C-alpha cells in the first residue's frame, strides 16, 4: 500500500511538470556538471563516463533545473543498463544537440515502441515514470529526440534543440 501511494504521488509530480523557465545555458557546461554529478555512481560500477564536446557550440534557451533532471535520469538509465564494467559517452555537437551513448544491454525493437509509455518499465522494480518525465520536459522545450540501440550494439539517446 505504501509503495502504491508513493508511486501515485511521484506520478502526479511528473504530470505537474512546471512550464519551463527558459534562460540562456551553455550546453557544454550543463553536460559537464551532470557528468560530475553522476561520476560517483559510475565509478562504483566501474563505468567510464567521458565527454566529447563541441567547443564551438553556443548556448540554448532552456530550463536548467528541468534539463539537469533529464540528463541525470538518462545517464542513470544508461549506467543501470550497463550494470558493471562499461562506458558512457556524452557528446555535444552543432547544430545544438546532446547525445548520450552507452554499451549496456541495448533495447529491442519491441521495447523501443513502448519506452515512453506511462507505467512501462524494463527494470524489475521500475515504475515507468522516468522516461515519461524526460519526454514531457523535452517536448515542452520543443526538442526532438530518439532512444535506440544501433547495429554497432551501442544505445544512443539523442536530443536535438530545434
Stretches with model-predicted labels:
Residues 107-119:
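Short conserved segment of the HATPase_c
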Residues 102:
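Acidic ATP/Mg2+-coordinating residue in the GHKL
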Residues 134, 138-139:
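Detector for a conserved hydrophobic position within an alpha-helical segment of the HATPase_c
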Residues 23, 43, 48-58, 93-95:
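Conserved catalytic submotifs in the C-terminal HATPase_c
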Residues 85-97:
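Short beta-strand/loop element within the Bergerat-fold HATPase_c
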Residues 142-148:
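Glycine-rich ATP-binding loops of the HATPase_c
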Residues 21-35:
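A conserved beta-strand-to-alpha-helix junction within the catalytic ATP-binding
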Residues 17-20, 59-62, 122:
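Conserved micro-motifs of the catalytic ATP-binding
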Amino acid at each position: 500500500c505504501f509503495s502504491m501511494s508513493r508511486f501515485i504521488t511521484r506520478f502526479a509530480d511528473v504530470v505537474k511538470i512546471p512550464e519551463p523557465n527558459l534562460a540562456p545555458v551553455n550546453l557544454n557546461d550543463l553536460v559537464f556538471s551532470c557528468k560530475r554529478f553522476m561520476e560517483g555512481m559510475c565509478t562504483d560500477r566501474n563505468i567510464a563516463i567521458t565527454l566529447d564536446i563541441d567547443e564551438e557550440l553556443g548556448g540554448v534557451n532552456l530550463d536548467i533545473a528541468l534539463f539537469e533532471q533529464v540528463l541525470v535520469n538518462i545517464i542513470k538509465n544508461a549506467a543501470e543498463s550497463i550494470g558493471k564494467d562499461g562506458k558512457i559517452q556524452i557528446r555535444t555537437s552543432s547544430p545544438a544537440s546532446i547525445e548520450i551513448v552507452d554499451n549496456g544491454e541495448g533495447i529491442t525493437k519491441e521495447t523501443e515502441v513502448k519506452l515512453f509509455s506511462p507505467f512501462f518499465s524494463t527494470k524489475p522494480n521500475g515504475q515507468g515514470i522516468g522516461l515519461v518525465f524526460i519526454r514531457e520536459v523535452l517536448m515542452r522545450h520543443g526538442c526532438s529526440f530518439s532512444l535506440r540501440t544501433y547495429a554497432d550494439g551501442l544505445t544512443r539517446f539523442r536530443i536535438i534543440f530545434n
